[in-house]
């Protein structure tokens, strides 16, 4: 019997890098409400007392970036100088320029379906049947822990009123013959008010954050718990560390369980294949696994700037496939249009649906409807996390001729 350990981590919405991601995606969403054809590449940096918004944006929309940035920061929980960062009073610096026309001529075409990729690059999508969300268990649990921290922190009459926004979680799982069998270690660090005793903090975090989330079947006498192991975490958020958009790409995806092409997601409109193609191949891999064609599936796709058709599509099922990887690849080419236009249409991506994805992972989330009013005053209902649907599983299984 082979045995090994595997670890993944997540960070809360109050982590400085995630603050930056959420601002970038809030800017993207606000622009898409007014201008669905906008080209957006928005980068954010947050540090003590300031948020800097930069990047390249081409749009007919007008957005009050200062007010929007402040709202995101305050909604996260940085609303007072007492916690070290106050969205109401921090400086907001706008350094946004326009997208290069050299790029634009390769993306926009007379025929929409001929839309070229916004850049060259390679992207990976992954799915596994070890959790109901088709996500690796370590990253799935890590996300739920920091999500629970925020839920308890924001709760009215919170049982943990001393919690602050910044937090991190890490899960180490033991695998036996490739199957997750136990939690070997749990690490959770949460920012807190001064004055809380370490003993009281540890007990409260165990009861209110860990206990509701950790699967009891995987806990055992030897499970190690490290809760605020430094003993103090008062200084956090943008005061403790500079935050940058796109610096948590492994947290955003599969926690290291799958490969990564290197491109970040937040602040990018769906013409950027770094984002849209990564969503598409997650959709593909998840439907392959949901169809029962494999227990694990990783799909790679690559593009050339200005070219519509993918340069390559490859599939790996790590020996878990019920049919050959070659046959799965043929089914993917048959049922999924992985041109940029095809992806945008297939997943209905030109809507303000992105800010929710900027914390707690872009994958493994439940699709949900979001309503908004567009620039014509019309009410529109869009689906966030549309790439998490498994609506192609049945036809894939049928065409694979699996019983």
UniProtKB/Swiss-Prot annotation:
Q: Where is this region: Flexible loop?
A: 99-109
Query: What Pfam families does this protein's entry cite?
Result: S-AdoMet_synt_C (PF02773), S-AdoMet_synt_M (PF02772), S-AdoMet_synt_N (PF00438)
Q: Where in the cell is it found?
A: Cytoplasm
What the entry lists under Gene3D superfamilies is as follows:
3.30.300.10
> What EC designation does it have?
2.5.1.6
**Residues reported in the UniProt entry to bind ATP:** 15, 166-168, 232-233, 241, 247-248, 264, 268
UniProt entry keywords in alphabetical sequence:
ATP-binding, Cytoplasm, Magnesium, Metal-binding, Nucleotide-binding, One-carbon metabolism, Potassium, Transferase
Name the residues that bind Mg(2+). 17
Cofactor dependence is on:
Mg(2+); K(+)
Main localization (coarse): cytoplasm
Q: What class of enzyme is it?
A: transferase
Which pathway does the database say it acts in?
Answer: Amino-acid biosynthesis; S-adenosyl-L-methionine biosynthesis; S-adenosyl-L-methionine from L-methionine: step 1/1
Residues bound to K(+) are: 43
**Residues annotated to bind L-methionine:** 56, 99, 241, 272
Return one Gene Ontology term, BP aspect: S-adenosylmethionine biosynthetic process
UniProt similarity note: Belongs to the AdoMet synthase family.
Q: What does the UniProt function comment say about this protein?
A: Catalyzes the formation of S-adenosylmethionine (AdoMet) from methionine and ATP. The overall synthetic reaction is composed of two sequential steps, AdoMet formation and the subsequent tripolyphosphate hydrolysis which occurs prior to release of AdoMet from the enzyme.
Q: In its UniProt entry, what is this protein called?
A: S-adenosylmethionine synthase
Q: Specify the species.
A: Xylella fastidiosa (strain 9a5c)
């Amino acid at each position: 019997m082979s045995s090994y350990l595997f670890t993944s981590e997540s960070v809360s919405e109050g982590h400085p890098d995630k603050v930056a991601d959420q601002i970038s995606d809030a800017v993207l969403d606000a622009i898409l409400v007014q201008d669905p054809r906008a080209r957006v590449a928005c980068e954010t940096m947050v540090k003590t007392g300031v948020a800097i918004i930069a990047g390249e944006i081409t749009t007919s929309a007008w957005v009050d970036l200062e007010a929007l940035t402040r709202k995101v920061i305050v909604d996260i929980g940085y609303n007072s100088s007492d916690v070290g960062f106050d969205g109401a009073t921090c400086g907001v610096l706008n350094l946004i320029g326009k997208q290069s026309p050299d790029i634009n001529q390769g993306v926009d075409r007379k025929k929409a379906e001929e839309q070229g990729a916004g850049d060259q690059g390679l992207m990976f999508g992954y799915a596994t049947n070890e959790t109901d969300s088709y996500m690796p268990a370590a990253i799935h649990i890590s996300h739920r822990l920091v999500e629970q921290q925020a839920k308890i922190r924001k709760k009215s009459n919170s049982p943990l009123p001393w919690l602050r926004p910044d937090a991190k979680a890490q899960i180490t799982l033991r695998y036996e013959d490739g199957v997750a069998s136990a939690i070997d270690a749990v690490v959770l660090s949460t920012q807190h008010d001064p004055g809380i005793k370490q003993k009281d903090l540890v007990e409260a975090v165990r009861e209110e954050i860990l206990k509701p989330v950790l699967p009891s079947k995987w806990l055992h006498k030897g499970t190690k718990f490290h809760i605020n192991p430094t003993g103090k975490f008062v200084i956090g958020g943008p005061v403790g560390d500079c935050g940058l958009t796109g610096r948590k790409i492994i947290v955003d995806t599969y926690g290291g369980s799958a490969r990564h092409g290197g491109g970040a997601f937040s602040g990018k409109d769906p013409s950027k294949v770094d984002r849209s193609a990564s969503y598409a191949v997650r959709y593909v891999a998840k439907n392959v696994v949901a169809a029962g064609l494999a227990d694990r599936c990783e799909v790679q796709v690559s593009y050339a700037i200005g070219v519509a058709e993918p340069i390559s599509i490859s599939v790996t099922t790590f020996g878990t496939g019920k049919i050959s990887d070659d046959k799965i690849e043929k089914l993917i080419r048959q049922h999924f249009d992985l041109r940029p236009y095809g992806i945008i249409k297939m997943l209905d991506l030109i809507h303000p649906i992105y800010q929710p994805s900027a914390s707690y992972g872009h994958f493994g989330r439940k699709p949900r409807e979001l309503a908004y009013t567009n620039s014509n005053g019309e009410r529109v209902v869009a689906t966030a996390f549309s790439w998490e649907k498994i609506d192609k599983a049945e036809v894939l299984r049928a065409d694979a001729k699996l019983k």
